[in-house]
Swiss-Prot record:
One of its GO terms (molecular function) is cobalamin 5'-phosphate synthase activity. Its cofactor is Mg(2+). Its EC number is 2.7.8.26. It catalyses: alpha-ribazole + adenosylcob(III)inamide-GDP = adenosylcob(III)alamin + GMP + H(+); alpha-ribazole 5'-phosphate + adenosylcob(III)inamide-GDP = adenosylcob(III)alamin 5'-phosphate + GMP + H(+). Pfam families: CobS. One of its GO terms (cellular component) is plasma membrane. Pathway: Cofactor biosynthesis; adenosylcobalamin biosynthesis; adenosylcobalamin from cob(II)yrinate a,c-diamide: step 7/7. The chain crosses the membrane at residues 4-24, 39-59, 61-81, 108-128, 196-216, 255-275. This is Adenosylcobinamide-GDP ribazoletransferase. It is a multi-pass membrane protein. It comes from Methanosarcina barkeri (strain Fusaro / DSM 804).
Amino acid sequence: MNSYLLAFKSGFGFLSTIPVGISMEGIDELMKKIYFYPVVGAVLGLLIGAVAFIGQVIFPGPVLAALLMGFIYYITGFNHLDGITDIGDGFMAHGSLEKKIKALKDTTIGTGGVSFCILLLLTLYGSIRAVQQEGSAVFGSNLPVLMFESMFIAEVSAKQSMLTIAAFGKPIPPREKQAYPGLGAMTINGATRKNFLIGFVFGAIVCFLPFGWIGLLPYLGACLVALVILNRSYAHFGGLNGDGIGTANEIGRVTALIILAVLLQLSLNGYMGGFKWTLL
């Protein structure tokens, strides 16, 4: 199989539950061409957006928000959400760097992990509802289209957040101490500046298409939040691992939706100035 097709296919095996099959050869190709992360995110975003579009026509808002959350994790899996719980335990652990890393890698879930996970899920639900409510006031009958495009941008932003945090991070343990690097370290090692820029430009283009310049704001916001997560990971653990990358995915998605909701609120109140909303 062509190396690009293998990397693209492996992206779905690695970042979703779509049963395309995955092998170490495929993972190696994906890590060499890790700019496929936002490309895979775009395809997943189309699927999630389609469910949002159809669901907005059929279901009441709160029901659709809950169903959308279920579909997001049905199609993307819970691996990245597990990263939130591990990061939460590590952040809440007291003591030395070694104790924090031990809590990070502990397979049991503590209070910090449970709390972080609950807060993330509540914020995801709230951000979807906020886009629905503010979007209904701004776009009226075009709300299903808005929901489609918002969920699309959120998923592209989530995957580019992973690429962003990996591109600027250093692995735990350092490369020179890695006998057999894990998937997190492989992601960091593959996220070169070149691969980051290719993915970033692709993500910016596809997020520009639905809303024009406004579509870039949630995308850029998610990438900036990924760097904040990286900063906190350095402060607590002295580096980055797969849990931090997964956390960037989850928080990046929520960040994009929150920014979209805020922009809709500002638009409703007449504070958007010369910026105009566009719908494909």
